[in-house]
Swiss-Prot record:
The lineage of its organism: Eukaryota, Fungi, Dikarya, Ascomycota, Pezizomycotina. The keyword Cell membrane does not apply. Pathway: Secondary metabolite biosynthesis; terpenoid biosynthesis. The gene is nvfK. Keywords: FAD, Flavoprotein, Glycoprotein, Membrane, Oxidoreductase, Signal, Transmembrane, Transmembrane helix. It comes from Aspergillus novofumigatus (strain IBT 16806). This is FAD-dependent monooxygenase nvfK. Belongs to the paxM FAD-dependent monooxygenase family.
Length: 470
């Protein structure tokens, strides 16, 4: 008699969750997706940037061509400072030359729509399924939903975002079975220091397709990305007056967004374009608190967290969605190895736990690096202290030709699906060559030289600047 199939229950029809569904389908691993909302791809004004590390995985899944039709590759970045100084560089063009994939921005809704419409078995993606409880026992796990349904699997995956119910359930079970495993410090480790008004606007004269503007200001930064047909994806990120601890964080309405944009309306971001123009041309917009954290408890028994449910960043370096896509690819690869290569269809609790420990051991160091870069990025863009003001205004412009090298370090060691062929377009000198890490090492050394120069020179600049001001 044939053994029961290994089954994965995915909580959350997010980009991470749907990517995992595609990956598992390619590996012929049984699964089901439970989404709490009544539709998979609502238009909420959110946008995402797809970088080569995420793009190569979607290319492996055969989805990249559909996404390219909807987008315009970014080529040029303009950086603007409060004193009127600005410079431009070809960071994005260099990224494309190094990796074979462009960087592009698109509606989050459109990416979700492509992920859903191209998925071959819609009966495995269920909506109106709010997970209320996680249960685990020897050899199995299940979740219950608010309509009374129960879904059992060998593995439960939380891809349900920053407000993850599965994360809360993991903590609840851990507190019962292993008190102290999830510490009080970890439960209070996610914080909010910034708010973000984000939106999508109709084309504006002066904001050309394929370009990006990053306006550094004191306590404020504005990011615009100009997509296909001139459509503008934008973020207005502001420093709050104090740090908040999740879940006791501010909640914002559309009225709050309007009041903020009205107050900031005359602030110029690029040439004659002001924040008010973005708001007036909006098609959709929203406002939210920006949570930041990388949790330390990634899995418990037969449940694991992916994407924003376990590592949450601000949008400044554009790696949030890409990181979730990588999570999905690595987990699918490990499951495939367990079920299809080792032929363990019904693994023990110990075997599943070892697989999840392996996942965390691989992903945590990379995500910690990306998280640190993101945390520093938003604080430099908002000129959070004197050091970052000098660094952003006087040092970074001198190293603009090296920005692609620095950005490459967040791309080059990204996870891929190890059971599917590498895409043909995954080419260029940026990727590591088999048996040869020289390019990556050289890039890392160049970054070290740049950072060492900053460390040595910046204190003198701080002293001189302080003397002039005070």
């Amino acid at each position: 008699m044939e053994k029961a199939k290994f089954k994965v229950v995915i909580v959350g029809g997010s980009i991470t969750g749907l990517t995992l569904a595609h990956c598992l389908h390619q590996a012929n691993i049984d699964h089901i997706v439970l989404e709490r909302r009544h539709e998979i791809a609502p238009q909420e004004g959110a946008s995402i940037g797809l970088w080569p590390n995420g793009g190569q995985i979607l290319d492996q899944l055969g989805l990249y061509g559909e996404l390219e039709k909807l987008t315009e590759p970014l080529n040029v970045m303009h950086v603007v400072y409060p004193d009127g100084f600005s410079y431009s560089n070809t960071l994005f063009r260099q990224i494309r030359e190094r990796f074979g994939y462009p960087v592009f921005f698109m509606d989050r809704q459109k990416l979700l729509d492509v992920l859903y419409k191209t998925y071959p078995n819609k009966s495995k993606i269920l909506v109106n399924k709010l997970v209320t409880e996680l249960r685990q026992s020897d050899g199995a796990a299940c979740v219950m939903t608010d309509d009374g349904s129960t879904y059992e699997g060998n593995l439960i995956v939380g891809a349900d975002g920053v407000h993850s119910r599965l994360r809360s359930e993991i903590w609840r079970l851990a507190d019962i079975n292993q008190p102290g495993l999830v510490t009080a410090e970890e439960k209070q480790s996610m914080t909010v220091e910034y708010s973000c008004i984000f939106g999508i606007s109709s084309p504006l004269p002066g904001l050309a397709s394929g370009e990006h503007v990053n306006a550094y200001m004191n306590g404020l930064t504005v990011l615009t990305f100009h997509g296909k047909g001139g459509r503008v994806y934008w973020f207005v990120i502001q420093k709050l007056d104090r740090k908040f601890t999740y879940p006791n964080v501010p909640r914002f309405s559309l009225d709050d967004a309007e009041r903020s944009c009205t107050a900031l309306a005359k602030i110029r971001i690029w040439r004659d374009i002001c924040i008010g123009h973005l708001w007036q041309a909006r098609e959709v917009a929203s406002m939210t608190a920006l949570e930041e954290n990388i949790f330390t408890t990634w899995h418990y028994q037969r449940a694991i967290l992916l994407g924003d449910s376990i590592h949450k960043m601000t949008p400044n370096i554009g790696q949030g969605a890409n990181s979730g896509i990588e999570d999905a690819a690595l987990l699918a690869s490990l499951i495939n190895h367990l079920v299809n290569i080792q032929a363990i269809k019904q693994p023990s609790d110990l075997t599943v736990n070892r697989m999840l420990e392996n996942f965390e051991a691989i992903r945590y160091p990379r995500m910690e690096k990306i998280y640190r870069r993101s945390k520093f990025g938003v604080r430099m863009h908002t000129r959070d202290d004197l050091f970052k003001r000098i660094l952003g205004r006087y040092v970074i412009p001198l190293t603009k030709d090296r920005l692609a090298v620095m950005a490459s370090q967040l791309i080059v060691d990204g996870a891929v699906l190890d059971f599917l062929p590498q895409p043909k377009r995954r080419s260029g000198p940026g990727w590591p060559k088999p048996g040869n890490c020289r390019d990556g090492q050289n890039g890392h050394k160049r970054i070290q030289y740049i950072l060492m120069s900053i460390v040595l020179v910046a204190p003198a600049w701080v002293y001189i600047f302080s003397s002039l001001v005070w």
